[in-house]
Structure formats: structure tokens, C-alpha cells
Amino acid sequence: MNAFNRSEIHALTFSQEVDPCELQANEVLDIVLSRRFGVEYQPIVEVQAGEIVGYQAAARFWTKDQRILNAGRMFACLHKNPLLLFHVELELKKLQISQFPGSGWLILDLDIDSFFEGGASLQNPFLQLFKEYAWSDCELIINVVENHNMADAHRSQRMIELLQQSGTAVALEDIGVRWGMFSLSAFLDASVIKFNGLALKALNESAAQATLDWLVSAARRIGVQTILDGVSTCEQFDWARRMGVDCVQGSLFARQVIQVRNS
């Protein structure tokens, strides 16, 4: 499928998002128990061919009256209750995998706290779920989501080890552009590394170019795929091509209209 064919892919337009922090605790609980959550698949486009090679699944939440919640703030609320966080993450992963519309990469975000609520062994329910789809048409890649503290740097490495031992590929996000879990070991262990285009924009042009050039060159030498996120203009797409990035992602490419609601 050609990523630029707007007759095949249509943009999803959302109304203004609601901050979950404005809701009562019983309203947040009702969203979880009533399964008012779903998934949006965001295309990942190969730079040279302009073709979709996979999708990244994004969580979506709704209130009882069908208002859209800010997903990031919703997860922040769920972090206050580890059991609810674990439950929602596991149910979302089941949904995101089962409703995947095609083949190729399926990148799933997985929070470190959610993952370790399931234990630090190969019996972790997330690992068991991913193993069920090891031979499916989609290639699961888990994007390790950290909370940016020193403890997470160590837990991230352990999470990567467990994912690899269970046969699941790993993606690392925002490499080299903000403080996080970057380490040589993590860099070498990843199958995919993602760069945040918005963070790169915050750098001056020469710094952004030098950062991306160094990281892309290193990734190419060790066989790691690269994705530049936050691509919203043709100029940014052309820049990614010149810099040798393998794939891009962002609002330039309309999201596929596959959005699952459980009501």
C-alpha cells in the first residue's frame, strides 16, 4: 500500500481531548471496567520506496459520553494503581495484536512499570502473550517505554534481556536526544531505534544533523533499523531521506481508519 494514497488511508480527526485528572476516581475506574479503550494504527513508511512497512499501535480511551481522553495523562493516572495499570496494559496488548489489520512490523509501546508488575521471569504474562504470536504474519517489536530515572535504566536492560530470551524484538525510543536509558548495550540489543523529530527540532540545525548522522551511521553498521518520528512536512521527509534514515512516522502520513472500541 502506498503511504501517500489518501483514497486508501484517511486521517482521523479527534475532538479536543479530556484530561483524565479532571475525572472522579469512579469515572476512571468505569472506563477500565467498561473497556472503553481501543487502538489506532499509525503507519511506518519506508523512506526510499514510500511504502508502509508496518504500524505502531496507539492506545485510545473514551469517557461514558464518548469524549476522547488524553492517553498519556490516562496512563499517568493508572500509574497510581499498579494493578489497574497492569490490567489495562495487558488487555490493550491483546487488543492491539488481535486487531492488527495487515502484516509487517507491529510496534507496541510497553511501559516498564506495567511489564514488571507481571514479574521478572520468563513466565511474565506479557512474554507469554507475545510468544503466542511468534509465527504470525506480524513481526512484533516492543517499544520499551521508560520513565527517565536511573532505576529505569537498569530495569530497562533487564526487560530487554527477558524480551530477547522469549524471542521478541525490541525498539528503543528517543535515542540520543534526551536523557534516558541510552547505553551501548541497549543500542546493540535493539532491532529498531526511533528518533524523536520534535526533540531534534529543539536543537540547532547543525547539532540535529550531526546527532542523527552519527546515530544512523552507527545503527547501519550493526544492522539496526532506524525510524524518525514526528515527520509532518515534505521537507522533513526529504531531510530524513538525505540523512539515510530507513523509515519515518508522523502526521504527514494519515492514520489508517482502524479504531476499535469496546463499549
Give, region by region, the residue ranges found by the protein language model:
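EAL-family c-di-GMP phosphodiesterase catalytic domain
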Residues: 1-36, 47-51, 61-64, 147-149, ...
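Short histidine-centered catalytic/ligand-binding loop motif
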Residues: 75-85
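Catalytic core of bacterial c-di-GMP phosphodiesterases, primarily the EAL and HD-GYP domains
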Residues: 85-155
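Structural preference for beta-strand elements that scaffold enzyme active sites
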Residues: 38, 54, 105-109, 139-143, ...
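A short, well-structured catalytic beta-strand-centered motif of the EAL phosphodiesterase domain
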Residues: 40-75
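Short, solvent-exposed loop/turn at the beta-strand->alpha-helix junction
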Residues: 177-179
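Surface-exposed amphipathic alpha-helices with a cationic face
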Residues: 130, 157-167, 213-220, 241
